């Protein structure tokens, strides 16, 4: 007997996600790099917890440079950091460096890691795969935004992109401004 009791379920409070961007600035990405950097700069202004990196053959953290309120000084800082801009790409090596250094401090289960790259890499594909597997162990979400994916008849045929796909939560198009929104 008695009256039925209705338990109120408590919902967990929504916690903000930490956004970490890694932007490929190698030669094959030179057409898109400026737009992606503007996108990342806007993200950094909108979210004080966001973190940002450039990569080509090496990885460079650009968070502080993008937060500089003096635009000319920020551009100067970026140009000093981006030595190698428009050159080759070693995505796997750069991702591995990110995982073994910065990810320990800036990536956890509330993080979303956004990689802006076409996937063209001079490393062996297993280097990308191993790095993304290690990053996945940190509990983050991973989004790979590829500007080539918006092309008609695009298929991820590069070895590096194929190696990355199984580790991603989302493989998205990034060839228009609306794709980045």
Model-found features: residue ranges?
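Acidic, polar low-complexity linker/tail segments
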Residues: 1-19, 30, 34, 42-51, ...
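Short acidic, S/G/P-rich loop/turn micro-motifs used as interaction or catalytic elements
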Residues: 28-30, 120-124, 151
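Von Willebrand factor
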Residues: 73-111, 153-156
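Exposed acidic/Ser/Thr-rich ligand/metal-binding surfaces
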Residues: 92-141, 172
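Short beta-strand-loop
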Residues: 54-78, 158
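Von Willebrand factor type A / integrin I
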Residues: 132-181
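Short hydrophobic beta-strand that contains or immediately precedes a catalytic carboxylate
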Residues: 20-24
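Cofactor-binding loop segments of dinucleotide-utilizing enzymes, especially the Rossmann-like FAD-
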Residues: 55-57, 118, 147
């Amino acid at each position: 007997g008695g009256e039925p009791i209705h338990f109120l379920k408590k919902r967990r409070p929504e916690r903000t996600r930490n956004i970490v961007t890694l932007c490929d600035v190698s030669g094959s990405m030179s057409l898109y790099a400026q737009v992606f950097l503007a996108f990342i700069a806007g993200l950094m202004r909108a979210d004080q917890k966001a973190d940002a990196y450039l990569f080509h053959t090496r990885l460079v953290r650009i968070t502080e440079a993008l937060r500089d309120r003096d635009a000319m000084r920020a551009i100067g800082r970026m140009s000093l950091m981006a030595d190698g801009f428009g050159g080759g790409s070693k995505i796997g090596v750069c991702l591995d460096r990110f995982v073994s250094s910065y990810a320990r401090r800036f990536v956890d289960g509330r993080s979303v890691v956004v990689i802006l790259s076409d996937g063209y890499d001079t490393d062996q594909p297993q280097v990308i795969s191993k790095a993304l597997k290690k990053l996945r162990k940190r509990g983050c979400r991973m989004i790979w935004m590829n500007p080539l994916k918006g092309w008609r008849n695009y298929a991820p045929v590069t070895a590096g992109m194929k190696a990355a796909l199984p580790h991603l939560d989302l493989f998205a198009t990034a060839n228009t401004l609306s794709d980045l929104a």
